[in-house]
């Protein structure tokens, strides 16, 4: 976690953590949507940069991993009677995506950097939430 804390410019506010704990169904729905979006982004990059073998390999691995996580979260939701719905993107992710540059080379770099920030933030948040979640969610 030290590397993640050094990478992120600030910690998630405790108010976000309290709100997430108070509404765990939305937390799970949002997490499933984030996993799906990450997989879709990886697949989109595979289409756009199909002549880049290294990128194809990494994005293929990422898409599979994110879809597996999506499936796992949706299963947890189903076990808890939580209906999957699509939520609008968070302001955090939307704000980061809004600064992605348009020229092709810069756009790829920006998309990868934004993805790294979103993934790091997710890790940071779940590390803080985990001790306060039930056993099944802690293991996930």
Regions flagged by a language model, labelled:
Residues 1-140:
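Non-heme di-metal
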């Amino acid at each position: 976690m030290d590397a993640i804390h050094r990478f992120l410019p600030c910690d998630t506010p405790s108010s976000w953590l309290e709100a997430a704990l108070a509404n765990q169904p939305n937390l799970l729905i949002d997490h499933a949507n984030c996993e799906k979006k990450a997989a879709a982004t990886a697949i989109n990059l595979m289409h756009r940069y199909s002549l880049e073998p290294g990128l194809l390999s990494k994005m293929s691995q990422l898409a599979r991993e994110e879809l597996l996580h999506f499936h796992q979260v949706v299963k947890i939701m189903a076990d808890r009677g939580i209906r999957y719905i699509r939520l609008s993107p968070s302001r955090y992710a939307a704000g980061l995506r809004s600064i992605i540059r348009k020229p092709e080379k810069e756009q790829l770099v920006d998309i990868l950097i934004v993805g790294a920030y979103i993934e790091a933030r997710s890790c940071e948040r779940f590390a803080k939430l985990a001790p306060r979640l039930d056993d099944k969610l802690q293991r996930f």
